[in-house]
């Protein structure tokens, strides 16, 4: 008959009463209540002591020689309250400089102090490997923002499929490029962008949708080969929210005009079709006035970028306190005994890691935050 956990006090009282009655020996009473003789003698001795013998006694040791002194805990807590974004390592580093003769607790102990005081909250993170989409981005000057997209699939009269890639300046509406390509793969698109960058310089940012070759669904932050290259060039890559083409509305409107004027009827072959695209681009930029531009043509508003296309791709520069890791040939980095997959398009590249909370690290490629990861679970969080 084991004691009921729901009411241990009553069971202890019944045990003592059975001993006092003289009907049971200690051994018999312990067997009857399903406890050991050691436990039985413990409660009998406490009964003999008198007051409050039924109550549980604290198991806390009388002294804790390893406990962090209260004054040290106070230093940690006060510094954290003054700098709410600092993690344990940064707090300890600053405290060691301010109090060089003081023995400070370990990083894990510091984290425990902060957690006990309610100064660490579990980070709210989006556990999704797909890019969440970027709201519409405003432009105020030419080259603040370029937009790029493919306008579907078309077929020439000789039966060849082709895909129009278009690049436009958001502010001036200038159609920078309209190329008929045989595929939407990045290896076809990159030469178009290289030519445009050589002739016109670099924009501050490029806005695209989430389709290939601009995004890769199974890579962290959707990093495609084009996206990685643009980061290296210092170009911000924004993507519209999935299913919301209206966030790239000006480009979509231009596409409707291009489809009507440059694809109907289709060209006899790809060479003929490209001539039709060139003629449309000239008319759109040089001839057609735009009401939103005060009835000016895009060519009257557009100017080339002052940012030249570099001969050599600049190397990333990271802060001294960052942890650096080289991406393996299969797109992983090794950190804290875990292998984290980022993107096969980053192979051989160096990324930087910065701890932003206890066990939570931000991963940067150049100056772009590409992901966050949890060193405890081994999860990468987009």
Where are these regions (language model features)?
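C-terminal, beta-rich DNA-binding module of retroviral/retroelements integrases
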Residues: 285-382
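Charged alpha-helix within mobile-element recombinases
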Residues: 222, 226-310, 352, 356-357
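Acidic/histidine-rich, metal-coordinating catalytic segments
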Residues: 184, 197-220, 241-243, 248, ...
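Mobile-element integrase/transposase regions
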Residues: 70, 108, 112-168, 172-174, ...
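Mobile genetic element proteins and their domesticated derivatives, centered on retroelements
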Residues: 15, 29, 40-43, 75-76, ...
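Short, Lys/Arg-enriched anionic-surface-contact patches
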Residues: 1-14, 62-70
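Short, amphipathic alpha-helical "recognition" segments used to contact nucleic acids or chromatin
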Residues: 7-24, 73-82
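Basic, flexible linker segments flanking DNA-binding modules
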Residues: 51-147, 153, 224-227, 245, ...
